[in-house]
Design a protein with these regions (language model features):
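Short glycine-aspartate micro-motif
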Residues: 8-12, 97-101, 172-177
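Short beta-strand-loop/turn "lid" adjacent to the catalytic site in phosphate-handling enzymes
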Residues: 61-122
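A contiguous, well-structured pocket-lining segment that forms one wall/lid of small-molecule binding clefts
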Residues: 219-301
């Protein structure tokens, strides 16, 4: 990408599978960035549950073929849903939009076998909205010997320059991105080569285990403001066992929510389970921060953001 400023819509649906985040920005992809619009569009209850059910069915590569009919059906629905979002935004900004970044909905991710599957038909979306669509981000990263995740560090690299200038925060600058999976980025300096200037990795679960526990044990979808976790008590024995069983030994592989589950909290009350799972999640994020700052040669300020 040259130094030209592009106006783009980016659409992302994370592992919570509850809806689509849409952002309209203007950027050259290097050091200039302006936010124009951020919106959230929630999936209806039926689509949300069907997505969760489908993801639970897909346990291996063979299942992608086994459930191909259901995958194709929901993929079309997902694509049309994204198209409606773009058309709504385009009513205000149509003549300014250069391209669309379309992530889709991940239902299976296994970088070890070089497989990742996102629901979303980029070609159909382009036909629906009559605009250029960039898609298959994770597949292309894996084809080029990447892990397919995390992808946000490229954006963190750009934003770090803005933060450095506006807020006078010195490099290196860290980002803790807590989505379904948590990932940590460290941007080393302002003008480094992007391939050498970023240290980034998945650190463990973000909201995925907490959300799973809430969905299984209540009619809620998530722990709003952490109120449920605040009302319970940590079961230290179970927490220690979970840490021993799940602690990340290496940060060179991307993670999927299927790398973790809430089975270790079975038998606990709803509140105590939520509290213990939340502390387990926080512990792994803290260990990731410790690893990110392993040389301890410079103080790093970390910005916490949600996925």
């Amino acid at each position: 990408m040259n130094n030209k400023l592009y106006t783009a819509i980016g659409l992302m649906s994370g592992t919570s599978m509850d809806g689509v985040d849409a952002s309209l920005i203007r950027s050259n992809g290097i050091d200039k960035f302006t936010k124009i619009l951020n919106e959230y569009h929630e999936y209806d209850t039926s689509l949300h549950q069907r997505l969760i059910d489908l993801r639970n069915f897909i346990l291996n590569f063979e299942d992608l073929e086994k459930y191909s009919s259901k995958i194709n059906e929901i993929e079309r629905e997902i694509t049309i849903f994204h198209g409606k979002i773009i058309n709504q935004i385009s009513l205000k900004y149509d003549d300014k939009i250069d391209l669309i970044g379309f992530h889709g909905q991940t239902i299976y991710h296994n970088p070890g076998k070089k497989i990742t599957k996102q629901l979303g038909d980029g070609k159909l979306l382009s036909q629906l909205i009559k605009k250029k669509v960039i898609f298959d981000f994770r597949q292309e990263d894996i084809k080029n010997n990447g892990q397919g995740a995390p992808l946000t560090p490229i954006f963190h690299n750009l934003v770090s320059k803005y933060i450095n200038k506006k807020n006078q925060i010195l490099f290196p600058i860290g980002f803790i991105n807590i989505g379904g999976i948590s990932n940590i980025t460290k941007v080393l300096e302002a003008n480094g080569n992007i391939e050498e200037n970023i240290e980034a990795f998945d650190s463990g679960p973000g909201n995925c285990l907490i959300d799973e526990w809430i969905r299984i044990n209540s009619k809620k979808k998530f722990d709003n403001y952490g109120q449920i976790a605040q009302s319970g008590k940590i079961d230290q024995l179970i927490l220690n066992q979970a840490i021993d069983n799940f602690e990340i030994q290496s940060y060179d592989k991307s993670l999927d929510i299927k790398n973790f589950d809430t089975s270790f909290a079975r038998g606990l009350s709803f509140e105590d389970g939520c509290t213990t799972i939340t502390n387990f999640t926080a512990y792994l994020i803290a260990k990731g921060i410790e690893y990110s700052n392993k040389d301890k040669s410079k103080n790093i300020k970390y910005l916490i953001c949600g996925g």
